[in-house]
Regions:
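Conserved beta-hairpin
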Residues: 54-70, 85-86
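Conserved acetyl-CoA-binding loop-helix of GNAT-fold acetyltransferases
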Residues: 112-115, 121-135, 160
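Conserved N-terminal entry element of GNAT/NAT acetyltransferase domains
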Residues: 1-14, 18, 22-30
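Conserved GNAT acetyl-CoA-binding A-motif
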Residues: 107-110, 136-149
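Conserved acyl-donor/pantetheine-binding loop and adjacent beta-alpha core of acyl/acetyltransferases
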Residues: 71-112
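Conserved GNAT-fold acetyl-CoA-binding loop/helix
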Residues: 25-46
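Conserved active-site alpha-helix within GNAT-family acetyltransferase domains
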Residues: 126, 149-167
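A short helix-loop-beta-strand connector motif used in the catalytic cores of GNAT acetyltransferases and
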Residues: 46-59, 75-82, 109
Length: 186
């Protein structure tokens, strides 16, 4: 049985980092990445711990072990992960429903979602996202993330729980097209 919870401490952070490493785009072959998805960012332990002290991320547990995670990344951490800094700068230029994101403290970035292979296609992604909403809808109006167009499984999953595409852009340095997706909780 899978239960949804918030990160409780450093052991959870270590288990998140393990799942992240195992499922990173450079750790899985192309066919697996295409069919099962992959993670893009590798967080350093110090930053991930700080993020979870401020706003604990959602985890899925089975028999006490973290089998999935949905990271909560408040805007205040925008400068802590260099690879994400361009994304935050770009988000500052966007509007949602005719309102600028820049200066609006009522949104956060869903930093990454990952489900252990043995728990995929069991509703864990959806369960974690719904727990995220239950946990933070009183403090935030929306969550935003970006998903590589080369990761169709992730795009489908995000759309299924309620994310909508708000912007698409090409990153020439990474030779990748990204979809910026938003889940408006209002």
């Amino acid at each position: 049985m899978v239960e949804y919870d918030l990160v409780r401490g450093e052991d959870d952070v270590a288990q998140i980092l393990d799942l992240q490493r195992i499922n990173h785009r450079y750790a899985v072959d192309a066919a697996t990445g295409q069919s099962q998805g992959y993670t893009t960012v590798q967080h350093d332990p110090e930053t991930l711990s700080a993020m979870n002290r401020r706003y604990p991320s959602v985890v899925a547990r089975s028999e006490g072990k973290v089998v999935g995670y949905c990271l909560m990344m408040a805007q205040e951490f925008r400068d802590r992960i260099p690879v994400l800094m361009p994304m935050f700068r770009m988000l500052d230029t966007l509007d949602w429903r005719e309102q600028p994101l820049a200066g609006n403290p009522r949104w956060f970035v869903m930093g990454q979602v990952c489900v252990a292979e043995a728990y995929r296609a069991m509703g864990v992604f959806d369960g974690m996202n719904h727990h995220l909403r239950e946990s933070y809808a009183d403090r935030f109006d929306m969550t935003i993330t970006e998903v590589s167009s080369a990761n169709p499984r992730s795009l489908r999953a995000h759309r299924r729980v309620g994310f909508e595409t708000m912007h698409v852009y090409e990153d020439p340095e990474a030779d990748e097209v990204w979809e910026v997706v938003i889940w408006d909780w209002r």
